[in-house]
Amino acid sequence: MDLVIRTLDGNEAGRLKVSESIFGLVPREDILQRVVRWQLARHQQGTHHSQGRSDVSRTGAKMFKQKGTGRARHSSARAPQFRGGGKAHGPVVRSHAHDLPKKIRVLGLRLALSAKLKANDLIIVDELNVKEAKTKMLVSCFSKLGFKNALLVGGKEIDINFSRAASNIPNIDILPIQGINVYDILRRSKLVLSKAAVEALEERFK
């Protein structure tokens, strides 16, 4: 399939042939959900911790004698039913990361790209370069291209002036092609790929 290439000024700059196996798949929400969940789980802190009965600082002595008081039998004051006792089955420090097959991760990225194209939320530009790091100028360019909320993906290296100019614009994310991922694609309304990024994706998924 052929896609239109645009300049940052919004003008047409030719057409680019892209692979159906990358941009022409039927979106599957179940695969996208699995990949996003896998990504977020890897970044979840997991530093939560509550004190169990073995952690709280209380005496280990038996509270009162076993028989003769008429009360229920109790041993340790650290038991969870007592005030100041340990938490039963509380959270512990752990990693929330789980495995996901590489084939599913690769398929998820292809499906995310296809979903953006199917929804007319994919824009391809010739390059993500500007001569001066002027935020006002870049906002004007984005307006001509028709977006205020987008992920922009460049080649292996992002132009320093472009990065500086875009860094102060809300709801705009910039990534090199190595950092492209399903979560960042889906969390923004539009996906903007440079010609170099598309070529890198074609090479990657050969």
Curated annotation (Swiss-Prot):
Q: How does it assemble?
A: Part of the 50S ribosomal subunit.
Task: Kindly give the Gene3D superfamilies that the UniProt entry links to this protein.
Answer: 3.40.1370.10
Ranges where the record places region Disordered:
65-94
Q: Which GO terms describe its molecular function?
A: rRNA binding; structural constituent of ribosome
Please give the organism.
Bartonella quintana (strain Toulouse)
Q: What family does this chain come from, according to its entry?
A: Belongs to the universal ribosomal protein uL4 family.
Functional description taken from the UniProt entry: One of the primary rRNA binding proteins, this protein initially binds near the 5'-end of the 23S rRNA. It is important during the early stages of 50S assembly. It makes multiple contacts with different domains of the 23S rRNA in the assembled 50S subunit and ribosome.
Q: Which UniProt keywords apply?
A: Ribonucleoprotein, Ribosomal protein, RNA-binding, rRNA-binding
Output the GO biological process annotations, alphabetical, semicolon-separated.
translation
GO cellular component labels: ribonucleoprotein complex; ribosome
Gene that encodes it: rplD
Question: Which NCBIfam families does the entry mention?
Answer: rplD_bact (TIGR03953)
Could you tell me what this protein is called? Large ribosomal subunit protein uL4
Compositional bias, Basic residues, is annotated for: 65-76
Q: Source organism's superkingdom?
A: Bacteria
